[in-house]
Amino acid sequence: MSVKRFNPDINVGLNVEEVTKRYESNLVNFDPSSKTKSFKQIILENVFTLFNIINIILSIAIILVGSYKNLAFMIIIILNTLISIIQEYRSKKTLDKLKIISEAKVKVRREGVDNKLNLNEIVLDDIIILETGNQVVVDTVIKSGEAEVDESFITGESETIYKKTGDMILSGSFIVSGNVIGQVEHIGNDNYTSKIVNDTKYIKAVSSEIMNALNKIVSTISMLIVPIAILLFYRQLYLEDSNITNAVVNTVAALIGMIPEGLVLLTSTVLAVSVIKLSRRNVLVHDLYCIETLARVDVVCLDKTGTITEGCMEVVEEKKESNKNIGSIIAKICTALNEENPTAKALKEYYHSELLDEEIIKNISFSSKRKYSGIVTNKKTYVMGAPEFILKEKIDKYRNKIDKYTKEYRVICVCEADNAKLENVHVLGFVLLRDKIRPEAPATLNYFKEQGVTIKIISGDNPNTVLNIAKRAGMKEDIEMIDATTLKTDEDIMNAVERYTVFGRVTPEQKKEIVIALQNHGHTVAMTGDGVNDVLALKEADCSIAMSTGSDATKNVSQLVLLDSNFSSMPEIVKEGRRTINNIERSASLFLVKTVYASILALLFIFIKMPYPFIPIQLTLASVSTIGIPSFILSFEPNNERVTGKFLPNVLKKAVPPAITIVINILIIIIISSILKLTYTQTSTLSVLMTGYTSFILLFKVCQPFNMMRKCLFGSMFLLFVFGIVKLKTIFSFSSFTLPMIFTTILCIITSHYFYNLIEHILKKSLENAKKMQEEKRKTLLKQI
């Protein structure tokens, strides 16, 4: 549908009637990138998960039969949900505060009066006034004036662009110098930045080994749980001396044992603690699981601005070609023009000496066309800028010097001339500038190198400039660079990402393609960014990191936000991630033992004509002493080793031997119980005892190498378990020990060690053979290629 456009006088702007019509037609600007989840959305998404729904159904079953003491497992579910809600809400509040702080007001002219309006109050065809230093919030056509515009936020290119009457200034850019009056051309989704953001509306699944493993376990169990529940309940109900209460309690005991609710809580808790630690280092974490992803990262893609450099220039040296004080001349020019581009700021910071004592007649503003700026005084004309544009044919005299300087620096030529036409121009000297490297950048880059993490620098700037910056920041001398304009196809990008370290003149779309290509090569990729031009790549990356000084769109799509925009936080984030994930992986084996043996037992007891050997409250003792407390304490130990391998295979390798051993023990106990005519309470007591004992064998292995803390942990947990068996019999429904029970216990202890070691040995050999076969297959494929 075509929209009727207004053409207001730039000195008057829209009138009240025209503005009202725009509001009625909903032609009002809004920022689609700035919305965060509502509190209601956060609650609903965290409460109604498949994991929670399964446990709620089981708890309802327990409540219906009145066995309230067996509801202890729901405490874990509630805690886990609360942690997730609180963490996500904290992130939302911090983001909303950042938005309020960074939200710019816009000077809008209506009915001849200039007022500062919010972003969402601007309407189509409004007349807006843009001055030096302003951010452009909507696509605007210049109606009067001219300006130098910095579009690096949206394109990555640091060179300013000259804009004049009739030109379009894109939203997301900044006015570096000059003042213009413009008319709003696009609003809302039609703005350039909004179109980029809209390309990222799909939700990319979080690349988390732990989350994927937990989801895989829960989804598998959810498919099995209904048929198992029906069959097991039927079997338990029609046993001799059984009733509906016993059948429900026994069935729920089997089913909750299959669900690793403790592992979910441990993971959420430990990650939440990591989030709190990182917040003290000014790091905002959106997604708990991105800490794990960052711990697994082997490639980090950086933009030079805001990470390696501070986003500003610095004067390095002054090369005089005359006796004149060029500092006073530069200071005079900078004061007169009051430009805000990075070069002008660096010159003003360096040259704050006494100004040139001459009267200014005319200012010569910088433009990308003339490439210099200056002043005309009552005595001379003084200019500074690009040597080739000032000297023209006279440049040959200084060619060797300039070529030497430009290898490492941006060269500003300072000259005097007789008039503004630069007649009889004389070189007074050269000022050498360069991008200011962050003091912490070399140490940060060196840390990643030592940790085996590859760095890729992706920028919209000239590749030679970016390469020099990379080398100054301490990257190795033999790194290679490429101009991304030469990468025409996906195949070109696939080949380039493995060979080159520095990518220059990269478009926003190419940044995304580079990230995808690295992932296709099997890498786990982290991406840092601050501009709208980084949004597409940030959404594709396995772990996305934004600077707080960046756009709202960038901060909202990123999993981590560096609140002080300090890249030196990265090593600490990685260390925290590695400590957290390594320890969760180690502790997870304790939890998955229960999931494995409970799943096998649930299937077996569909066919075995005996009551399920546990009730929920009994499993609580074994779980707390061999899993809950030990895993929680072990998860906070220091551990900076790089995370390798797949989470689930790594964990199952440790969990399967004790789980199968527990199943064998329980089968032995059932057989002996049938022969010796032991009661159900005696059978369940023996089952809990041997389940706990076998779990302690695994805990012993997990605690190695022992230190004082681990010795105390293991000893105290063993005593707690024994105390529960002996002194808390009534609470946990245990029986006193008889001679047949003692005999059965001794037999099971012996068989536990035998079967544990046997299964561990078989599993180890099987994995080694599988690894060899995989390696041989890989070699065969390479030979064929």
Regions from the PLM with identified roles:
Residues 53-75, 223-260, 272-282, 598-616, ...:
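Helix-interface capping motifs at the ends of transmembrane segments in multi-pass membrane proteins
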Residues 3-4, 13-16, 103-212, 410, ...:
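Cytosolic catalytic regions of P-type ion-transporting ATPases
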Residues 29-107, 347:
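Transmembrane helix-loop-helix hairpins at the membrane interface
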Residues 296-427, 433, 446-447, 455-467, ...:
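Cytosolic catalytic regions of ATP/NTP-dependent phosphoryl-transfer enzymes
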Residues 230, 234-237, 373-396, 402-517, ...:
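Cytosolic catalytic headpieces and adjacent flexible linkers of membrane translocases
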Residues 7-35, 79-82, 86, 90-93, ...:
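Actuator/coupling domain of P-type ATPases
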Residues 232, 477-526, 541, 548-710, ...:
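Membrane-embedded transport module
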